[in-house]
């Protein structure tokens, strides 16, 4: 098994593998890879010279230190269970001294702990708010505007502008976006009639009206909380106050 950094020639394979593994719209996957050079890099696993797997690693800053955020790891069905995924993760570990990720399912936390040493976990809780009408002012934000307002909150996480751009396009594709009301900001998308809010900073009193405008029955707001459900897994200690709710997921 050979692991190497991706090239543009790998993009058709990586785009197809992503779609088959995760079911995301091709237009979003293509946009991700357009932005990837500004966000980080990716690695490809080869078996006998044939690409069989991939792992994307994005740049993030956690508590003032750079780290790699592992995202959209996938291998072809015919090689699953043969070590391609583990080989990719071990390569990521060699290339980045500090790594974190959001496992796609609870069963993957132990796998990431084994192959990445990612045994430190942050947590979050989910709050539900019903839709309702009000005369509160709500504005759509561009990714740069959202990033600028987010920086005013002095959080312990930061990301490249391209990260916010991809977040915005993903959320807009699924009926949501990035919004502000007063000094509050929120980023989210629609899923089965629910506004899934990745992050809301500031008072949430505008959320009922935002739900109404977007046609959602209710909102589910993700908030960092040390005693909540497992969220980000990392190979380095995480503060209880870690706010990485805007993680790509």
Language model features with spans:
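Extreme N-terminal starter segment of soluble prokaryotic enzymes
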Residues: 1-3
């Amino acid at each position: 098994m050979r692991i190497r950094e991706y090239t543009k020639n790998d993009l058709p394979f990586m785009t197809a593998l992503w779609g088959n593994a995760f079911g995301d719209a091709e237009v979003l996957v293509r946009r991700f890879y357009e932005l990837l050079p500004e966000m980080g890099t990716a690695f490809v696993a080869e078996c006998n010279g044939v690409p069989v797997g991939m792992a994307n690693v994005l740049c993030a800053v956690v508590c003032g230190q750079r780290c790699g955020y592992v995202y959209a790891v996938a291998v072809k069905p015919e090689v699953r269970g043969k070590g391609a995924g583990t080989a990719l993760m071990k390569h990521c570990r060699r290339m980045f001294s500090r790594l974190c990720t959001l496992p796609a399912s609870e069963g993957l936390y132990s796998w990431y702990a084994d192959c990445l040493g990612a045994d430190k976990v942050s947590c979050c809780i989910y709050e539900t708010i019903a839709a309702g009408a009000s005369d509160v002012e709500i504005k759509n934000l561009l990714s740069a505007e959202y990033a600028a307002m987010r920086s005013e909150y002095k959080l312990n996480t930061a990301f490249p502008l391209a990260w916010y751009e991809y977040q915005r396009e993903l959320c807009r594709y699924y009926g949501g976006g990035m919004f502000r009301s007063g000094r509050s900001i929120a980023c989210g998308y629609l899923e089965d009639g629910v506004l899934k809010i990745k992050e809301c900073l500031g008072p949430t009193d505008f959320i009922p009206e935002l739900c109404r405008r977007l046609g959602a029955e209710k909102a589910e707001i993700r908030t960092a909380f040390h005693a909540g459900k497992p969220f980000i897994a990392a190979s380095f200690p995480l503060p209880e106050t870690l706010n990485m709710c805007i993680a790509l997921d």
